[in-house]
Regions:
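C-terminal edge and immediately downstream basic/flexible tail or linker adjoining helix-turn-helix-like DNA-binding
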Residues: 91-98, 106, 110, 132-135, ...
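Structural recognition of an alpha-helix C-terminal capping motif at a helix-to-coil junction
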Residues: 45-52, 65-77
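Amphipathic, Lys/Arg- and hydrophobic-enriched alpha-helical face
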Residues: 22-40, 57, 137, 182, ...
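Short, charged helix-capping/linker segments at alpha-helix termini
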Residues: 11-20, 30-49, 169
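N-terminal module of bacterial RNA polymerase sigma factors
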Residues: 1-28, 113, 121, 138, ...
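Sigma70-family region 2
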Residues: 11-12, 35-38, 51-66, 85-87
Length: 204
């Protein structure tokens, strides 16, 4: 069943159809929330909040873009807002803010490394790369992190990213260019976009 058909069913009162939409996309939405906010537990809460908010607003959803794009817009906006608010709460001084960011990045990298150890399909080199990317993502600014997650990990095209972030297409391209440079400098100049995509979901 196509997403549009499920959306129409929900609008007609068949709320169980929304459960199918959640099952289809909750893992990828969670992954994006986690990459952006940097906290596993917060990402779970943000994922639930995103699907709840989308459900409550479904009556106003015009379907000019797909549900998949729309739910990501909701989730990314919530994650970025959460991160900004979290940083404001934590930042007592510039030094304290920098320390908090570093701690958050290290924690995300550790969690990713632990998960990689449990994955028999991922070798030690790839596991370390996976963890390095996770940590480096948290050291990027919010705009750069979001566009890297959406393009190089989740695989959205430029037009979809423009709709999700609600920015011009040209801004997506220039922001992604700068974000990739920043990420490569934070990890290793040899890292490629294909490696980032594999880290995201294991497929091209």
């Amino acid at each position: 069943v196509e997403d549009d058909a499920l959306v129409e069913r929900v609008k007609q009162g068949q709320t169980e159809a929304y459960g199918e939409l959640v099952r289809r996309y909750q893992d990828r939405v969670f992954n994006a929330c986690w990459r952006i906010c940097g906290h596993l537990e917060d990402a779970r809460d943000l994922t639930q909040e995103a699907f709840l908010k989308a459900f409550e607003g479904l009556g106003n959803f015009r379907q000019q873009s797909g549900f998949y794009t729309w739910i990501f817009r909701v989730a990314v906006n919530l994650s970025l807002s959460h991160r900004r608010n979290d940083h404001r709460r934590r930042r007592v001084s510039l030094d304290a803010g920098a320390a908090a960011t570093g701690t958050q990045a290290d924690e995300l990298a550790r969690r990713v490394r632990d998960e990689s150890d449990d994955d028999p399909t991922r070798g030690p080199v790839e596991a370390e790369l996976h963890a390095a990317v996770a940590g480096a993502l948290q050291r990027l600014d919010d705009d750069h992190r979001a566009v890297i997650v959406l393009r190089d990990i989740e695989g959205f095209d430029y037009q979809e990213i423009a709709r999700i972030l609600q920015i011009p297409l040209g801004t997506v391209k220039s922001r992604l260019f700068r974000a990739r440079i920043a990420l490569q400098q934070a990890i290793d100049p040899a890292i490629t976009r294909e490696e980032l995509k594999r880290i995201g979901d294991g497929e091209d």
